[in-house]
């Protein structure tokens, strides 16, 4: 810990000061709020946004760590993030930011979003709530009722390499999952240029346990996954 303190003090966080990064509160900064900032996806999102010269994170939401310093949860954020974690009050958050990211389990974003919120901010959801256009398929797969089916049609699948212009205009962006992203980006250019036969495609994709989230589960224990592989689908 002492070594890390010396390291950060000597370098003074160059990644956040170079490349023309604006100062906190400076005009033109995009104010972002994150609900679910302490999960694995949320933590990675924080890291990426902290390195963006035009973004300022105003809200670190976490049900599990309300009023605790974010850097006490992710110690690699020591001297980078001084904020404490807040709740998931999306209506209040919409009054304070320009864009809301939800890095939460399936069902939460759909239960929180409403017309008033969408009139104020853009919502980028990292869960599956708005990826699947067929409500019945979503409910069968995730075993939950979809709370906001009225927004599914307008949600844009946020694969920016393909839907860049639509993402810019969308009120709700459904961030793609890991398997569809790696599969689509690999295959799309080949199909677009008619270089392969779509009927011959076989996708063999594997994920580490971080893809299952940060919550404790027997299936994700070290003794269960070490030197092991489990098929699912």
Question: Could you say what each language-model-derived stretch is?
Answer:
Residues 1-7:
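Short, small-residue-biased leader/transition segments that mark boundaries at the very start
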Residues 13-16, 21-233:
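N-terminal Rossmann-like NAD(P) cofactor-binding subdomain of oxidoreductases
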């Amino acid at each position: 810990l002492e070594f890390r303190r010396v390291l950060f003090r000597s370098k003074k966080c160059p990644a956040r000061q170079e490349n023309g990064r604006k100062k906190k509160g400076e005009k033109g900064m995009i104010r972002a709020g994150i609900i679910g900032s302490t999960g694995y996806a949320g933590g990675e999102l924080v890291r990426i946004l902290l390195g963006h010269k035009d973004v300022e994170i105003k809200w670190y939401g976490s049900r599990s760590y309300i009023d605790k310093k974010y850097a006490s949860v992710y110690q690699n954020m020591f001297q980078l993030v001084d904020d404490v974690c807040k709740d998931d009050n999306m209506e209040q958050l919409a009054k304070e930011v320009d864009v809301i990211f939800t890095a939460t389990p399936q069902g939460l974003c759909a239960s929180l979003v409403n017309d008033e919120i969408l009139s104020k901010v853009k919502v980028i959801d990292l869960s599956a709530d708005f990826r699947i256009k067929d409500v019945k398929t979503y409910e069968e797969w995730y075993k939950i009722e979809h709370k906001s089916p009225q927004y599914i049609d307008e949600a844009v699948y946020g694969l920016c390499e393909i839907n860049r212009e639509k993402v810019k205009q969308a009120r709700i962006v459904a961030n793609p999952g890991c398997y569809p992203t790696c599969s689509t980006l690999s295959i799309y250019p080949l199909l677009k240029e008619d270089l392969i036969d779509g009927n011959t495609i076989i996708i063999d994709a594997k994920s580490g346990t971080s893809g299952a989230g940060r919550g404790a589960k027997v299936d994700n224990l070290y003794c269960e996954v070490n030197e092991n592989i489990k098929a699912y689908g």
